[in-house]
Every structure is written in structure tokens, then in C-alpha cells.
Amino acid sequence: MTPDTPAKTSAQNSECSGSCDSCSSAQKTPRPKGLPPKVKVNINHVILVLSGKGGVGKSTVAVNLATAFANRGKKTGLLDLDIHGPSIPKMLGIEKERPAVLAKCIQPVMVTPNLAVMSMAFLLPDTSTPVVWRGPMKMGAIQQFLAEVNWGALDYLVVDLPPGTGDEVLSIAQLAPNVRGAVIVTTPQDVAVLDATKAIAFIKKMDLPVIGVVENMSGMVCPHCHEVLDLFGKGGGKKAAEKFAVPYLGAIPLDPAMVASGDAGKPFINADPESPTAKAVETVMENVLAAIEQDSRPSA
């Protein structure tokens, strides 16, 4: 009721049916609409790395992709949003590090001057502690990882997501600014490709670009002759990309040395930069950069 609106008489009040929703005289309070506001952070490009299923080497791709960006002098952040199974700190040899808290701001762990990392693993008392959270708590944590971590000015934030298309993917897509799209990781097998196509469809439904598809474990590098052997088949990732008319970013062979490097906490592209696997990762990174730069160009 405004100051110019006369108050209702007792006779009018006595006619109230008790149904405010259908009453023309009831004051309507507008309900909030739309998605939650974007977190205000100084990040030029947010890149999501996800897969339809687990065990395809998604985190390995994310670590080496972020490292490749940092090696090129790009200010890069790596955000581990696999809240229930964080593995990024182990793969970078920083699992014993703990982020400092200064002036109500969390400092990410610096791997190199160009690579900053934040993970749920840093906040757990030990590696065997489970995270038993539902959706709202995970969304709150993701918001904190974006808004309360002192990322500084970043060229790229690479986000390693859990397998599938659950709360974490929805939350980061809603909260993060400048999401340039998603890199979908799969292996050549039909089962993995089937789930990868679901991830592609999900990203498109979120109205986000699919930067492209990476086929990981595409053949295997022989530890003796270093030739790439067709062990698990090839071409599944390329077929998935063609089916949905999205870019194919390249294939990365399975390399036992790459597995050992991850267990030792060293990104493989730094440990053995001349190997076929490291060169394949560099090719994928160059294709990701090209896709983002093309998307960022102003239209004629």
C-alpha cells in the first residue's frame, strides 16, 4: 500500500477469502529470477575440462594443459573441482602444501610463478578423509574457490571437473565469468565415447561452446622402442567430434612414463618434452589456444 492508497475498510477486510494468490488487492512481492550472479574475478578465459566417465585421464590432461599455458608465459590458474576425489595436488607434487589465509583471502599454492593451484585436497586433514557433501555445500565451496581465492589477474583458469554432468559443472558454469567453453576428454573405446557424447550434449544444453574433443590413451607408446602401438584402438574421439560438429583437438597416446610422472608429481610435458606424448599435449594446447582466439575475435 502506498501513501496515496486509502486503507481498506473493515467491511472490505471482512470479505477476504484468505487466498492471497488469487486476490487482486494483494501486494505482490517479486520473486528472484534467473541464475546466480557471476563472481567478480579478473580472469580472461575459463576453460572447463570434463569427461563423461572416470578413468579417461581427464585430470592428467588438465594438469599438462595448464602447465603448457604457464610454460608459454601465460598467467594460469588450475582449479581442482573434483571435490570428492581431488588429485591435482598429488599430480603436481604439492599434496603437503597448505594455502595461506591473509586478510580474509585464500592464497593459492604457487607451483611456478605462472601457475597457481587451488584444490579441496589442501583443506582435508589427510588423503583418506572423504568429503560427504550435497549440492548446496558444493556450490558454496565453488563460489568460495572463485571469489575468496586471490587468483590475481589470470590469462587462463583451467578447471578440472569430476566425471559426469553433476552439480560441479552446473555451478562453475553459472558462477564463473568468461567461460570460453569445455574441453571434453575421452578414450577411444565405445563406452567412453558414448559418455563423452552425453557430456558434449550437456555443454551445448548449457549454451556453452565445446572447445573440442581430446582422445586420450590413443594408442600406447612402447617403453622399449618408443613407437606408438594401436593397443586400445583409435578414432573414437574424432568420430564423436564429427557427430556433434565440434572441433577435434587431437590425440594423446598412453605412455607408461606419463603415468609414472604423474605419480611422482611432475607434469609430463616438463619431464620429457621431446616424447611423442608431450608433443601431442603441445598440439592439443595449440589447438585450444587457436579455438579460443578465433572465438574471441570481433565479428566483421
What spans do the regions from the language model cover?
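Walker A/P-loop phosphate-binding motif and the immediately C-terminal alpha-helix
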Residues: 45-83, 200
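Phosphate-binding/switch loop-helix module in NTP-utilizing enzymes
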Residues: 124-172
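Phosphate-binding P-loop
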Residues: 38-44
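C-terminal boundary of histidine-terminating zinc-finger modules
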Residues: 264-275
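Cysteine-cluster motifs in flexible loop/terminal segments that predominantly coordinate metals
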Residues: 2-37
